[in-house]
């Protein structure tokens, strides 16, 4: 089954994700790069049956909209393959065959689509992204859409939504984006010229958003005119994984806070690895900076990564394209923010 693509529409648009019994939604008006948020929210199904949950959503006024759906990273795989030497109309079938050893379900159980890597020129011309979603995931989404009489125009993925958001401020330059919400994974993307070149899921320690990431006392001891390379934090780090004695201090943690700091360094290491790989691979596209989003802790995350990676790290801002952001609660923003990127999509494909 081919992922649908958006057609022109007007009026209010609903963007949703439906994963882990949580419906996240944003209702907006507008077009292009100028939107106004009408309302938003996060609704948990809990112990309700689908019928009862749908009734609750109807009572919230979420029935009958033109709707875009975004799949969360846990609902699909984004694979990168060598572009098969076939005609454009045969790309999907050829890509389906190539990924058979990269997925753990039967190919007949997958919905796939193919996307070019970057601008499709030079080094990027030999690569393709393949989106692979289990048919059961798509059916689950469309079942809810049917009950609520949504006119689903597109099913998008978070990688592409994140690309759209990070391209708002500096669309032509290469930028890295990291968006963190509650959960055990975060998504890191690198885009340039409004095109996605690199995407990677990074594991997070359990409870990451509530952990202590850095210690003020340690920061005060650091030289003010330099940053400490990541390698000094992780003397036992190896490419094959983390050892059981992973620690930033080289000694047994003295407190729960220090234990949190040690575990948080794993994210720092993986961010640095991704940046290093980018700089080695795409020498013609120097990284202009990193943009992060982590709800109320966005500024803290930006300062931490800026100090310890030496990159220009700032908070991801979307205000230029979206009015009414105060309609999204602080608590809901980490989950709702990626949905805004779906509103910015401008790909148009022929049926």
Q: What does each model-found stretch correspond to?
A:
Residues 1-351:
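Hydrophobic/aromatic-enriched cytosolic interaction surfaces used to assemble or bind macromolecules
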């Amino acid at each position: 089954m081919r992922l649908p693509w958006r057609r022109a529409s007007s009026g209010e648009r609903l963007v949703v994700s439906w994963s882990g019994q949580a419906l996240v939604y944003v209702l907006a008006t507008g077009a292009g790069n100028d939107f106004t948020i009408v309302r938003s929210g996060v609704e948990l199904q809990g112990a309700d049956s689908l019928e009862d949950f749908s009734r609750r959503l109807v009572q919230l006024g979420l029935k009958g909209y033109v709707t875009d759906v975004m799949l969360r990273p846990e609902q699909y795989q984004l694979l990168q393959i060598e572009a098969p030497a076939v005609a454009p109309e045969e790309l999907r079938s050829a890509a389906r065959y190539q990924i058979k050893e990269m997925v753990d379900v039967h190919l007949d159980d997958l919905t796939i689509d193919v996307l070019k890597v970057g601008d499709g020129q030079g080094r990027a011309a030999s690569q393709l992204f393949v989106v692979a979603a289990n048919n059961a995931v798509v059916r689950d989404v469309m079942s809810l859409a049917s009950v609520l009489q949504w006119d689903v125009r597109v099913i998008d993925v978070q990688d592409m939504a994140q690309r759209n958001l990070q391209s708002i401020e500096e669309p032509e330059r290469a930028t890295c984006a990291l968006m963190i919400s509650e959960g055990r994974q975060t998504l890191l993307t690198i885009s340039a010229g409004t095109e996605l070149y690199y995407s990677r899921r990074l594991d997070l320690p359990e409870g990451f958003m509530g952990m202590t990431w850095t210690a003020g006392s340690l920061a005060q001891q650091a030289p003010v005119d330099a940053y400490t390379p990541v390698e000094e934090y992780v003397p036992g780090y190896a490419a094959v994984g983390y050892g059981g004695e992973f620690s930033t201090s080289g000694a047994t943690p003295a407190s729960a806070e220090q234990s949190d700091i040690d575990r948080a360094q794993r994210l720092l290491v993986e961010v640095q690895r991704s940046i290093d790989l980018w700089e080695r691979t795409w020498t013609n596209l120097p990284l202009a900076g990193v943009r992060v989003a982590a709800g109320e802790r966005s500024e803290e995350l930006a300062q931490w990564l800026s100090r310890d990676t030496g990159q220009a790290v700032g908070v991801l801002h979307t205000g230029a394209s979206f009015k009414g952001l105060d309609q999204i609660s602080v608590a809901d923003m980490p989950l709702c923010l990626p949905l805004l990127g779906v509103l910015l999509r401008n790909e148009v494909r022929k049926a």
